[in-house]
Swiss-Prot record:
CDD domains: PA_subtilisin_like (cd02120), Peptidases_S8_3 (cd04852). Residues 1-21 form the signal peptide. Its EC number is 3.4.21.-. The lineage of its organism: Eukaryota, Viridiplantae, Streptophyta, Embryophyta, Tracheophyta. Belongs to the peptidase S8 family. It comes from Arabidopsis thaliana. This is Subtilisin-like protease SBT2.2. It comes from the Eukaryota. The gene is SBT2.2. It is an enzyme of class 3 (hydrolase). Its main location: secreted.
């Protein structure tokens, strides 16, 4: 008897969409009610999906026609389907209907007389459905011969004005694409996220130059129409928008008024990520009345299609996400951007075998480049939350702009801080008053300790004491949790006629990044607990008290706030952010490593300006604003999605792996000061605050948009290669067959991860010697390349050939022999650099972990 595979792991940012079906199945006379053991299951069937069947039949037609050209068709039967004579849309409609009917028939026959709710029928990327049933019914379904796999649905939750300049787009990649006026035009980027605010100028159907967008004829998506997403919300820029919440609705946790039963973004995250990748060029980013510059997406003329599957009140569920991926592929998106990661490793034979990664594998087979955030679970080794080689995983790095603020005390000590705030009057210092020393009821000890110091309640304070002075407030964990807000403290300070606000850090607030927050009055947040102690020590030592009563008779501490609305561009950058998830890539839940490099790349992800929804609530400090500054790998991924759109625009026939190769081999290893890129809490030196980054911190390096448009050589990987890799995993044959229909027993060419034709070489265990090969294709002109090596510690590298000439369109094989020089379990890193005489530089990082030398 086949067992039901129970998978229950959370995900750090997911969005979804699919073929919506809310069919309620009940056999005649059935009276068995759905009980407390019911749950949503994702069921995969053995029959191939529409996409796989279409491609198989198309290949068969081609084979017959090729044979006909040679005059021999006796051994072949012409397939019933001839893709040349039937439109894809007609084919998909017929297949969708047939597969959905088959799903309904299976459920009726298997669950006779019992109740169930089918949520979705998946037909395009995978053949299966999501269904709400009891555990006993799930067991019954698992015994059906048509059923390949049953997985318990799991919960999911959420995980630029300047960055185009920092990435060199205005004088580089945009110029190569004809300027920002055409950069990304004709390419559709799909976003699985929290939706979008269609009223934002970043998504207008005409850009700031009033040029209308063309119609992307290859795209067939639609726009939902609802009261809060009315007709006309979409245009030639925003070409598709849908929402999916069937799993949440079935569970009874969906609140339509709060979560918006439409593609409208009530959270803000989806609007932000979409604008980073493809927001219109030249949109003014005004926050709290201050203009912070003109915003632009990385591919400002690319089209956007939104698939909403995350919601502000509960997050989301995997069944909806799989449906979203399935629908996006049917619609014809070119790029798929997911700022999502599981917060626990998927159980089973390998991390790659889960419904999301398998759906994304089929999307890649359909020609879609899939970008995923690495996760914000760094900096620990093996904290990577995006696993599969067909997914392009992006970590987060800084850029050189910051909005520094500071406060100068009366003793001339300057303390750094954050806050997009006004400055106090130049050359003048103001008296500081602690909120705890300005209470109307000074005997309320509990309130003083627990709440009042956060300056959230106007009625607690004596206005006469605070008027015209700087109010000192505490920043506690309640701000992190959203129970207290900067915005409320500022409102209180204004009502009290304070001149400004100073927030000091509660010592219990550890490990949280405090982003610059908009303030419509002078203010500053001191993020360091140690610096906060300096402030408080000065303040307390400056108080003058009555010798008998100990009451304060004079506040002696004074200070001036420098303000933080002006940007500085002097930081050393990029550097890898501490929260960005690190490699090595975990192959399974037992901490075994995969021979796959993760992350693939890093991109700007820290303090990123992006469009913000008018109803957004994810960041209370930006509530009501049209732009917000956010940080995370969620912000890094759409940067790469935008660059991928530029690459796809130039090279229309590039496969997803070719795009990945172009992005990877051209990446940057040095910062703006010409030094090696650094990482906070780097993999090799986790105890040091900052040290040189390794491939396990930054993958191939920092994204280089301009160079990616002229990579010289590419390394292409096929769907069949991925199948050979999956079949090469010990014990994977049954699950590979269940998910893909591929029989590993008939696949003689199994390979390891290091044998995949990737633009990197990763070996988790080097036992004496291993030879790996890479097949290179020249997409530029004739060129001669010379090999340069950086040898990993304790590893010997031999590369053949050491020099080669390659014609345009030609392919050549590069052979690399790795030999362990001595036993070691410490990871070592190096690289292979191919220097072309026409100026191309192709970089291949080499990572080796465990090394076992031969006995002499």
């Amino acid at each position: 008897m086949r067992r039901v595979l129970m998978v229950n792991f959370g995900v750090l940012l997911l969005f979804c969409f699919g073929v919506l079906s809310n069919s309620f199945g009940q056999d005649n006379g059935g009276d068995s009610d759905i009980n407390s053991t019911t749950a949503v299951y994702i069921v995969t069937l053995r029959q191939a999906s529409s996409l796989h069947l279409f491609q198989q039949e198309a290949e068969e037609v081609k084979r017959v026609r090729d044979q006909s050209k040679h005059g021999d068709t006796s051994k072949f039967t012409r397939p019933k389907l001839q893709p040349r004579n039937i439109s894809r849309s007609r084919y998909w409609r017929s297949r969708r209907s047939a597969i959905a009917q088959a799903h309904d028939s299976l459920l009726r026959n298997a669950l006779k007389g019992e109740k169930y709710i089918k949520l979705y029928s998946f037909h395009y990327l995978i053949n299966g459905f999501a269904v709400f049933v009891s555990s006993q019914q799930a067991e019954t379904l698992s015994r059906r011969r048509e059923v390949a796999n049953i997985v318990l649905d799991f919960s999911v939750r959420t995980a630029t004005t300047y960055t185009p300049q920092f990435m060199g787009l205005p004088k580089g990649a945009w110029v190569k694409e004809g300027g920002y006026e055409t950069a990304g035009e004709g390419i559709v980027i799909g976003f699985i996220d929290t939706g979008i605010d269609p009223t934002h100028p970043s998504f207008n159907g005409t850009d700031t130059s009033q040029r209308q967008y063309p119609i992307p004829n290859h795209f067939s998506g639609v726009c939902e129409v609802t009261p809060d997403f009315p007709s006309g919300s979409c245009n030639r820029k925003l070409v598709g928008a849908r929402h999916f919440a069937q799993s949440a609705i079935t569970r009874g946790i969906f609140n339509s008024s709060e979560d918006y039963a439409s593609p409208f973004d009530g959270d803000g995250h989806g609007t932000h990520t979409a604008s980073i990748a493809a927001g219109n060029h030249g949109v003014s980013a005004v926050v709290s009345g201050h203009n912070f510059g003109s915003a632009s997406g990385i591919a400002p003329r690319a089209h956007i299609s939104v698939y909403k599957a995350l919601y502000k009140s509960f997050g989301g569920f995997a069944a909806d996400v799989v449906a979203a991926i399935d629908q996006a592929a049917q619609d014809g998106v070119d790029i798929l951007s997911l700022s999502i990661t599981p917060n626990r490793r998927p159980p089973g034979v390998a991390t790659f075998f889960n419904p999301l990664d398998m759906a994304m594998l089929s999307a890649v087979k359909a020609g879609i480049f899939v970008v995923q955030a690495a996760g914000n679970t760094g900096p620990s080794p093996k904290s990577m939350s995006s696993f599969s080689p067909w997914i392009f995983t992006v970590g987060a790095a800084s850029h050189d702009r910051d909005y520094s603020n500071s406060i100068v005390l009366g003793n001339n000590v300057s303390i750094p801080g954050v806050g997009l705030a006004l400055r106090t009057d130049e050359g003048k210092k103001y008296t500081m008053i602690s909120a705890l020393d300005a209470l109307k009821n000074k005997s309320s000890v509990v309130d003083k300790d627990m709440y009042v110091g956060e300056c959230q309640d106007y009625g607690s304070f004596d206005k006469d004491v605070i008027r015209g002075n700087l109010l000192i407030c505490s920043y506690s964990i309640r701000f992190v949790l959203g129970l207290s807000t900067i915005k409320q403290a500022l409102a209180v300070a204004k009502n009290l006629s304070a001149k400004g606000v100073v927030f000091y850090m509660d010592p219990y607030v550890l490990g949280f990044q405090i982003n610059p927050t908009p303030m419509d009055m002078p203010g500053i947040i001191i993020p360091s607990a140690e610096d906060s102690k300096v402030l408080l020590k000065y303040y307390n030592s400056s108080l003058v008290r009555d010798g008998t009563t100990k009451e304060i008779v004079r506040f002696g501490a004074v200070a001036a706030i420098a303000g933080g609305q002006n940007a500085n561009f002097s930081n050393r950058a990029p550097k890898i952010m501490y929260y960005s998830a690190r490699g090595p890539d975990p192959q399974d839940s037992l901490f075994n490593d995969a021979d796959i490099l993760k992350p693939n790349l890093v991109a700007p992800g820290n303090s990123i300006w992006g469009a913000w929804s008018s109803a957004a609530t994810e960041s209370t400090e930006f509530e009501g604003e049209s732009f917000a500054m956010m940080s995370g790998t969620s912000m890094a991924a759409p940067h790469v999605a935008g660059v991928a759109a530029l690459v796809k625009q130039k090279f229309r026939k590039f496969s997803p792996s070719a795009i990945a190769s172009a992005l990877s081999t051209t990446s940057v290893l040095f910062d703006n000061k010409g030094e090696a890129i650094m990482a906070q809490r780097a993999y090799a030196n986790p105890d040091q605050t900052i040290s040189p980054a390794t491939p396990f911190d930054m993958g191939n390096g920092f994204v280089n948009a301009t160079a990616a448009l002229d990579p010289g050589l590419i390394f292409d990987t096929s769907f069949e290669d991925y199948m050979s890799f999956l079949c090469g995993i010990n014990g994977s044959a049954p699950v590979v067959f269940n998910y893909t229909g591929t029989n590993c027993l008939r696949n003689n060419a199994t390979i390891s991860g290091s044998d995949l034709n990737l633009p990197s070489i990763t070996v988790s265990k080097l036992n004496n010697t291993r030879t790996v090969q890479r097949l290179m294709t020249n997409i530029a002109g004739n060129e001669t390349y010379t090999v340069s090596l950086i040898t990993p510690f304790d590893v010997l590298i031999n590369v053949s050939p050491t020099q080669f000439s390659i014609a345009s369109g030609e392919t050549k094989l590069l052979s690399v022999i790795l030999t362990a020089k001595r036993n070691s379990s410490i990871s070592s890193f190096g690289g292979i650099k191919l220097l072309g005489n026409a100026g191309h530089i192709v970089r291949i990082p080499v990572s080796v972990t465990v090394k076992i030398a031969s006995k002499q």
